């Protein structure tokens, strides 16, 4: 059968990177920071994966899209 009973204990609660480090503004020119929140294929990682709060996820998405538009980040990464 598909699935089955789940095993394991409690999952560790993800903490927002920006709240924990006191970052209030996400700059689109800071590509090293933005790359942490992009998958290896170039997609923006969701909140459930990164643990980012809703406020900072919106700011992060805007910054990544700006950086892509300014050609600082790629829209997609090539498959090897």
UniProtKB/Swiss-Prot annotation:
Keywords in alphabetical order: Ribonucleoprotein, Ribosomal protein, RNA-binding, rRNA-binding
Family designation: Belongs to the bacterial ribosomal protein bS18 family.
Species of origin: Staphylococcus carnosus (strain TM300)
Key word Ribonucleoprotein present: yes
Subunit relationships: Part of the 30S ribosomal subunit. Forms a tight heterodimer with protein bS6.
Molecular function via GO: small ribosomal subunit rRNA binding; structural constituent of ribosome
Gene Ontology terms: cellular component: cytosolic small ribosomal subunit
Pfam families noted in UniProt: Ribosomal_S18 (PF01084)
GO biological process: translation
UniProt name for this protein: Small ribosomal subunit protein bS18
Domain of life from the UniProt record: Bacteria
Function: Binds as a heterodimer with protein bS6 to the central domain of the 16S rRNA, where it helps stabilize the platform of the 30S subunit.
Taxonomic placement: Bacteria, Bacillati, Bacillota, Bacilli, Bacillales
SUPFAM superfamilies per the UniProt record, alphabetical: Ribosomal protein S18 (SSF46911)
């Amino acid at each position: 059968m598909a699935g089955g009973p789940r095993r394991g204990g409690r999952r560790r609660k993800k903490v927002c990177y920006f709240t924990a480090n006191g970052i209030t503004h996400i700059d689109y020119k800071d590509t090293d920071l933005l790359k942490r929140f992009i998958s290896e294929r170039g997609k923006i990682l969701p909140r459930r994966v990164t643990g980012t709060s809703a406020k900072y996820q919106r700011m992060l998405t805007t910054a990544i899209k700006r950086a892509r538009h300014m050609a600082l980040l790629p829209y997609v990464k090539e498959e090897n």
